């Protein structure tokens, strides 16, 4: 039975350098070489998961097929490799300590003093090794920055893995920043030297250093890094900025990253097939035209809050051979005129999911603008719920129509799903659910299938008591959950393209397999133009 090899990706100097994209690109390249891989994320924060974290702090919450609320990097892993992530692919310090304390209360430690070493580190190692049978490579990204106090148990666990398995089964990639000082007109390697020494102090020596920089890194600078950080010159690899993330697998292959990884493990190096990635990059660089899609939300100053959504639009654009220009519109704007002015040049309008009543009326104004001006509209999760509320108010004439999530009202179009408790964490309808599609609908035109499976993340559902009134007035309930209890999709029959879905189709879209709804939505934007 083959034994998996482990690739650990750490980051230094600053956060948000793109460790997740490095891990994703390495995974894609190893797949292209014919290897079976899996990518995991180790997050040092104390939350159990990011489910209750503010998107402005953490970015979007990516939902896996099996219902785990995870870090947005798992979305990158799926999009680059096509491998569905699971709840076993994301661990946090909070989850580790939660499990640790449960074991201690059960008496699993037989009266021993419970400590970071070995008990916390053993649980981290258990996560790293779990379910790796039959894999060639397991890629583990460590969140945060080397030197953070929260990262220390994870680095110690990696040190122990490295000690136990040896270099024949472990490689460490360190992503670092080489800042450019405009005043001195030169790149500075000193922060990288200090970052590597911090890593050394944890008992770890990087095998490969990836140098992120906005300027070209020359050989003399690479030689300096190699000499002072004790890494071979061929393993000091530039990681220049790119205009689009899907350029990265081809770029890293050209820089020799996959070659150096395989040489480290003394593996043969058949030439990888990157034709699919070349085609994707070509489509991005050579669009036939540009369309403008307005995204109306309350986190528009923080695009990472809508990471999968933006990527799904890009996938729809790639499929249609166009470029999507995103017009970010803050839904906290409650006046009709300013909203209209901000949307007037839109070829399509999208209202994404969200929580809380802040910005709700602004979204409803945007939905009304799309409906009454025949502009293609896509409502996702809360976006669908608000589209139905807008329709109920202005077409069905239920003036007090609203959602139980926000206030008591005479016509609760949206209600709480089933039995819920007061805790916010882990109480939602999460993960993949099947849905039956109306055969005579735009949904059917997009999917070409009457049964679909999509991922959900919501606590409230559409009140089915209003289904007949909605359909009688022209809003078709075109998607119903498999058990018949939830309205999953609606569409306006008299509109060129007006669809709302309760689920999150963006979580399943990939550059080489774009989601059919986003392909259809971008096509509608092209037709509108």
Curated annotation (Swiss-Prot):
Q: Where is the Glutamine amidotransferase type-1 domain?
A: 292-529
* MF annotations from Gene Ontology: ATP binding; CTP synthase activity; glutaminase activity; identical protein binding; metal ion binding
Residues noted as binding Mg(2+) in the record, renumbered to the chain: 73, 141
Q: Which residues form the active site?
A: 381 (nucleophile), 504, 506
Q: In which residues is CTP bound?
A: 15, 148-150, 188-193, 224
Record-level GO cellular component terms: cytosol
InterPro entries for this protein:
Class_I_gatase-like, CTP_synthase, CTP_synthase_N, GATASE, GATase1_CTP_Synthase, P-loop_NTPase
Name of the top EC class for this enzyme: ligase
Output one GO BP term.
'de novo' CTP biosynthetic process
Q: Where do the annotations place L-glutamine binding?
A: 354, 382-385, 405, 459
Disulfide partners = none
Pfam families xrefs: CTP_synth_N (PF06418), GATase (PF00117)
- Positions of region (Amidoligase domain): 1-267
Protein role: Catalyzes the ATP-dependent amination of UTP to CTP with either L-glutamine or ammonia as the source of nitrogen. Regulates intracellular CTP levels through interactions with the four ribonucleotide triphosphates.
One further remark on this entry is:
CTPSs have evolved a hybrid strategy for distinguishing between UTP and CTP. The overlapping regions of the product feedback inhibitory and substrate sites recognize a common feature in both compounds, the triphosphate moiety. To differentiate isosteric substrate and product pyrimidine rings, an additional pocket far from the expected kinase/ligase catalytic site, specifically recognizes the cytosine and ribose portions of the product inhibitor.
Q: Which family does it belong to?
A: Belongs to the CTP synthase family.
Protein name per the record: CTP synthase
Q: Which gene encodes it?
A: pyrG
């Amino acid at each position: 039975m083959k034994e998996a090899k482990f690739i650990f990706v750490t980051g230094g100097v600053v956060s948000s350098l793109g460790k997740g994209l490095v891990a994703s690109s390495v995974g894609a390249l190893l797949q292209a070489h014919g290897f079976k891989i899996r990518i995991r994320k180790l997050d040092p924060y104390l939350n159990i998961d990011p489910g209750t974290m503010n998107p402005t702090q953490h970015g979007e919450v990516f939902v896996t097929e099996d219902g785990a609320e995870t870090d947005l990097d798992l979305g990158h892993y799926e999009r680059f490799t096509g491998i569905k992530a699971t709840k076993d692919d994301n661990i946090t310090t909070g989850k580790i300590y939660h499990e640790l304390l449960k074991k201690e209360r059960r008496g699993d430690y037989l009266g021993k003093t419970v400590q970071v070493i070995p008990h916390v580190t053993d649980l981290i190692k258990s996560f790293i090794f779990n379910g790796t049978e039959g894999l060639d490579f397991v890629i583990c990204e460590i969140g945060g920055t080397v030197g953070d106090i929260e990262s220390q148990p994870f680095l110690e666990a990696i040190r122990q893995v490295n000690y136990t398995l040896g270099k024949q089964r472990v490689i460490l990639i360190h992503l670092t920043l080489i800042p450019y000082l405009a005043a001195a007109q030169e790149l500075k390697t000193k922060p990288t030297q200090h970052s590597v020494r911090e890593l050394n102090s944890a008992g770890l020596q990087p095998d490969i250093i990836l140098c992120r920089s906005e300027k070209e890194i020359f050989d003399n600078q690479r030689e300096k890094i190699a000499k002072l950080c004790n890494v071979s010159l061929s393993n000091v690899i530039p990681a220049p900025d790119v205009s689009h993330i899907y350029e990265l697998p081809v770029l890293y292959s050209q820089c020799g990253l996959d070659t150096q990884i395989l040489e480290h493990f003394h593996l043969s190096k058949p030439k990888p097939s990157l034709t699919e990635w070349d085609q994707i990059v070509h489509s991005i660089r050579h669009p036939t035209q540009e369309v403008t899609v307005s995204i109306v939300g309350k986190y528009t100053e923080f695009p990472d809050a809508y990471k999968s959504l933006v990527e799904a639009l890009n996938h729809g654009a790639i499929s249609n051979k166009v470029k999507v220009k995103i017009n970010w519109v803050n839904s906290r704007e409650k006046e009709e005129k300013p909203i209209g002015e901000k949307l007037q040049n839109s070829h399509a309008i999208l209202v994404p999911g969200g929580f809380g009543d802040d910005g709700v009326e602004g979204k409803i104004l945007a939905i009304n603008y799309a409906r009454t001006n025949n502009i293609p509209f896509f409502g996702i999760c809360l976006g669908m719920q608000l589209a139905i509320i807008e329709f109920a108010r202005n077409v069905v004439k239920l003036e007090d129509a609203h959602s139980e999530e926000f206030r008591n009202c005479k016509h609760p179009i949206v209600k709480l799903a089933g039995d819920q408790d007061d805790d916010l964490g882990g109480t939602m309808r999460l993960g993949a659910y099947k849905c039956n599609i109306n055969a005579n609908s735009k949904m059917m035109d997009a999917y070409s299938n009457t049964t679909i499976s999509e991922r959900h993340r919501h606590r409230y559902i559409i009140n089915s008591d209003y289904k007949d009134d909605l359909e009688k007035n022209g809003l078709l309930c075109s998607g119903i959950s498999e058990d018949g209890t939830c309205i999953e999709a609606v569409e306006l029959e008299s509109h060129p393209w007006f669809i709302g879905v309760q689920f999150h189709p963006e979580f399943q879209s990939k550059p080489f397999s774009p989601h059919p709804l986003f392909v259809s939505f971008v096509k509608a934007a092209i037709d509108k133009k």
